[in-house]
Amino acid sequence: MPETQEPASLNERDPMFEREKEKYERPIVSREYILSYLEGTGRPLTLEDIIAELEVAEDDQEALRRRLRAMERDGQLVRNRRGAYGIVAAMELVRGTVSAHPDGFGFLIPEAGGKDLFLSPREMRKVFHGDTILGRAVGEDRRGRIEGAVVRILERALKHIVGRYYADNGVHYVVPEDRRIPQEFAVVEGEGEGLTPVHGQIVILEITQYPDGRNMPQGHVVEILGEHMAPGMEVEIAVRNYGLPHQWPDEVLAEIKQFSETVPETMKAGRRDLRDLPLVTIDGADAKDFDDAVYAEVIENGFRLTVAIADVATYVCPDSALDREAVTRGNSVYFPRRVIPMLPEILSNGLCSLNPHVDRLCMFCEMEMDAAGRSTGFRFDRGIIGSQRRFTYDEVAAILAGDAELRAQDAAMVPHLEALHSLYESFAKARERRGTIEF
């Protein structure tokens, strides 16, 4: 009579057991196996069901409970009304991001693609624009849109809001400036010690209680921006509403202490010296930083063109605090009368700006072009330059148009500007031959 085969232990059934063993002193059932098991059962299971069916030891049951809660928090599982865990897809739930409309309604944008779910103003009272949630389709509205309901909020998009502070008959509340947030916020008394906003001022509120559809959200004032109509207030509001990083982390401030306002002689070694070349910058009249400089001259059968850009990489090392913050910011943001730079001012307006009559490190390309604007040779290199003039677009246009006073003032530069313009015309004709469309 053949021996009865013992059922495989949980350790043998869980394909990720060895990985869990490396991570934990007492390995527990992996997320992958939990998902696979629930998918196989085809029905939601309570914690007690899972413990019994997977034969989880008593000493491991608390760890399993925490794992299930973590999977629920991460949107891998969802609990129904009786506390049973199920797979999101199997329970016909949709994970996505809330997109709010100023008129009070919104949409759930599915992460996996597909049709958006319409969220009524009633459902939107539970969430904010940008929240990550689980939703469920519950039918169609009168316009034929698939209507959704909020099942669970996985991640809140907002921790602070900017709004106008009101104090009416002892009631203190804030109305958000972002019209996509229709809820008013009750101001919690006793918080934000030392801050006493005045009726009508713009404040920053830290959210302490989120809406649930029944109760008013709450928060306490952490910053007073000023009067509603103060000059520049619209910029301050926009910066906060769109979450633009506008303060430098401490590690960035510590890192830039190594820089001086001038380029050290040691950093100039091994670079090609272009300081005698009449490179110039050409930008708008209100430009604050100058990223590139140009020079052109007429040579036999064409032109020689040199384009130099600031050598930012020399100052911003990979994975440094500066590098990480620059990645977070992505680019500089320009407002009327204000710039939020991608790099601290000592770099953006200083060492990495090709200001006139100061030494700057650069990367440059020296190109030779024929009369038709075709490249006949080029080279890239690291160099050091001293821009010889900061031109504006209007000044260059006037010089090329024949302004006698400006041409006399910059007589040494005029031939190079005319060479640049002639080369531009060659490029423009080549573009036209290729069928390029001007917008």
UniProtKB/Swiss-Prot annotation:
Disordered, as annotated region? 1-22
Checking SUPFAM superfamilies in the record gives:
Nucleic acid-binding proteins (SSF50249)
> What GO annotations for molecular function exist for this entry?
exoribonuclease II activity; RNA binding
Q: Which residues form the RNB domain?
A: 271-439
GO BP term, pick one: mRNA catabolic process
Q: Which UniProt keywords apply?
A: Cytoplasm, Exonuclease, Hydrolase, Nuclease, RNA-binding
Q: Which reaction does it catalyse?
A: Exonucleolytic cleavage in the 3'- to 5'-direction to yield nucleoside 5'-phosphates
State a single Pfam family of this protein.
CSD2
Q: Does the keyword Nuclease apply?
A: yes
Quote the biased-composition stretches of kind Basic and acidic residues, using this chain's numbering.
Answer: 11-22
Keyword check for Cytoplasm, yes or no.
Answer: yes
Spell out the GO cellular component terms annotated for this protein, sorted alphabetically and separated by semicolons: cytosol
Where found in the cell? Cytoplasm
What's the name of the protein? Ribonuclease R
Role of this protein: 3'-5' exoribonuclease that releases 5'-nucleoside monophosphates and is involved in maturation of structured RNAs.
EC number per UniProt: 3.1.13.1
Member of which family? Belongs to the RNR ribonuclease family. RNase R subfamily.
